[in-house]
């Protein structure tokens, strides 16, 4: 096809008219100091607090200190090759992480990048790591249970959907084990889980991931990892990243559970960053805003009402509430719960589960101290049958502790006191539970019913565990319909009580303990 000169001229004019110059205006600065992962930048005039700053080599830093003549930023990743004079740019973006169902079953780092070798993640979009928590009007009261699978917790310290329940104790008292069992117990509950590992050994995290996979819970879980060898900035931000991933489900009318393991290490990482940024230290050398560090994170765990979900999804989801339940973990030193970070988190959360070294070493596992453990809002969410049956359990254990201490000094005890001690020691034995063996609502109900109605009275102490195992096996085979009904409805009425009693009477009559 031949073009004459006029056509060529017109074509060139048309192209010139359609040509658009896309100019990108970005503020550029120069690094003036580098030390311990902190960079000072001169020349960034309009940078935001928390903004991502682009460094050479596809890396980013986060602006934390905005000063008169410079900006203090923390590098997310390796910083050995950064030096004075290196040019950096603002991005105009706050840190965002990928969110969506594609993250379920995956292990990711703080930035949401996969580290499990399973290829790229198919995410549904991005969400800022720092989000303002839902307001008072957008929330709904906690009235649905989260079953942990532990008798001691579900009976005495119940947790509801949207609650923040602290797990606190010294090292090696079973804190992580309790949280992992709670995640394993959500396999069939529809609750999506997020496990955030902060400042732990990579081998420990690999073991947790392997256990979740073995028990079929990994497909329902997102694992966010910031190991002890990673930069303090990544350890500090990991809980916020995990929270953003959990909020994806909450805001769409679903239920999610997030475990922060643990927030003590996050506070230490934040303290390190703050001291390097030359912020004034306070109590235990923590900065003044360490309370806000945890409060703004834990306030995001909530149960939101139908209107919030409908507004967020623009009418795509109606008539559904969403929830994000948080299980933060705090490690104490020598049982000192009055230290700075433990007292902060205790005051923020809706209750706490105390795990004690002495109980753990004596063989009582989970090592829950029922005397000082409490759930401030979970009672309203407790399953009906467990709530009705477990009323006497806490009382029996509290009285047993008191009488056990007293009986050490008294040689002659009356029959009533002796009976209370016998009952208490058997209930304590019944509360023991193996790791990775969460129990269903019906199994817990049968065990607690046996304790409450005196069926453990003639059982030898060392045979209580065998008695429970045999009883549950018998009830599952002989009263399968009842077990199914309790698991599905959680109801408790005269008919269910009568059938439980008949089943236990028959079981006890055919067994010798």
Swiss-Prot record:
It holds the Pfam family ATP-synt_ab_N. Its main location: membrane. It is a peripheral membrane protein. GO terms for molecular function: ADP binding; ATP binding; proton-transporting ATP synthase activity, rotational mechanism. CDD domains: ATP-synt_F1_alpha_C, ATP-synt_F1_alpha_N, F1-ATPase_alpha_CD. Its EC number is 7.1.2.2. GO terms for biological process: proton motive force-driven ATP synthesis. The record marks 373 as: Required for activity. The keyword Transport applies. F-type ATPases have 2 components, CF(1) - the catalytic core - and CF(0) - the membrane proton channel. CF(1) has five subunits: alpha(3), beta(3), gamma(1), delta(1), epsilon(1). CF(0) has three main subunits: a(1), b(2) and c(9-12). The alpha and beta chains form an alternating ring which encloses part of the gamma chain. CF(1) is attached to CF(0) by a central stalk formed by the gamma and epsilon chains, while a peripheral stalk is formed by the delta and b chains. Produces ATP from ADP in the presence of a proton gradient across the membrane. The alpha chain is a regulatory subunit. This is ATP synthase subunit alpha. It comes from Shewanella oneidensis (strain ATCC 700550 / JCM 31522 / CIP 106686 / LMG 19005 / NCIMB 14063 / MR-1).
């Amino acid at each position: 096809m031949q073009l004459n000169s006029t056509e060529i001229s017109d074509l060139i004019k048309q192209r010139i008219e359609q040509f658009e110059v896309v100019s990108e205006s970005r503020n550029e600065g120069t690094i003036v100091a580098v030390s311990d992962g902190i960079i000072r930048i001169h020349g960034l005039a309009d940078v935001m607090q928390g903004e991502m700053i682009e460094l050479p080599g596809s890396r980013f830093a986060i602006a934390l200190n905005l000063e008169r003549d410079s900006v203090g930023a923390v590098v997310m990743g390796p910083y050995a090759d950064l030096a004075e004079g290196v040019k950096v740019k603002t991005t105009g973006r706050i840190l965002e992480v990928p969110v969506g169902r594609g993250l379920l079953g995956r292990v990711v780092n703080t930035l949401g990048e996969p580290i499990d070798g399973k290829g790229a993640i198919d995410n549904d979009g991005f969400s800022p790591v720092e989000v303002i928590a839902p307001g008072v009007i957008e929330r709904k009261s906690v009235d649905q249970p989260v079953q942990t699978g532990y008798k001691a917790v579900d009976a005495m310290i119940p947790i509801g959907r949207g609650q923040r329940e602290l797990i606190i104790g010294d090292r090696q008292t079973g804190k992580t084990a309790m949280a992992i069992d709670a995640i394993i117990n959500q396999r069939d509950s529809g609750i999506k889980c997020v496990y955030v590992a902060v400042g732990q050994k990579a081998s420990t995290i690999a073991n947790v991931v392997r256990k979740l996979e073995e028990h079929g819970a990994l497909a329902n879980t997102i694992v966010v990892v910031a190991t002890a060898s990673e930069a303090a900035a990544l350890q500090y931000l990991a809980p916020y990243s995990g929270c953003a991933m959990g909020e994806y489900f909450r805001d769409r009318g679903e239920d999610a559970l997030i475990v922060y393991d643990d927030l003590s290490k996050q506070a230490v990482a934040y303290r390190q960053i703050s001291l390097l940024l030359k912020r004034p230290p306070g109590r235990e050398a923590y900065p003044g805003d360490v309370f806000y560090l945890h409060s703004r994170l834990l306030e995001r765990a909530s149960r939101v009402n139908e209107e919030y979900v409908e507004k967020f999804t623009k009418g795509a989801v109606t008539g559904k509430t969403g929830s994000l339940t948080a299980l933060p973990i705090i490690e104490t030193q020598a049982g000192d719960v009055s230290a700075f970070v433990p007292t902060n988190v205790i005051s923020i959360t809706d209750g706490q589960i105390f795990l004690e070294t002495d109980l753990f070493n004596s063989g009582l596992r989970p090592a829950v101290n029922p005397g000082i453990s409490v759930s401030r809002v979970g009672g309203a969410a407790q399953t009906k049958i467990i709530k009705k049956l477990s009323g006497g359990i806490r009382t029996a254990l509290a009285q047993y502790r008191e009488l056990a201490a007293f009986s050490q000094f008294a040689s002659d005890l009356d029959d009533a006191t002796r009976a209370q001690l016998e009952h208490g020691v058997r209930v304590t034995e019944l509360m023991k539970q193996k790791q990775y063996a969460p129990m269903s609502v019906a199994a817990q109900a049968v065990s607690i019913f046996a304790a409450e109605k005196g069926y453990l009275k003639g059982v030898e102490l060392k045979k209580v565990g065998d008695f429970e195992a045999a009883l549950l096996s018998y009830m599952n085979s002989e009263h399968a319909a009842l077990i199914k009904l309790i698991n599905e409805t959680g109801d408790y009425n005269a008919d269910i009580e009568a059938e439980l009693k008949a089943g236990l009477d028959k079981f006890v009559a055919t067994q010798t303990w």
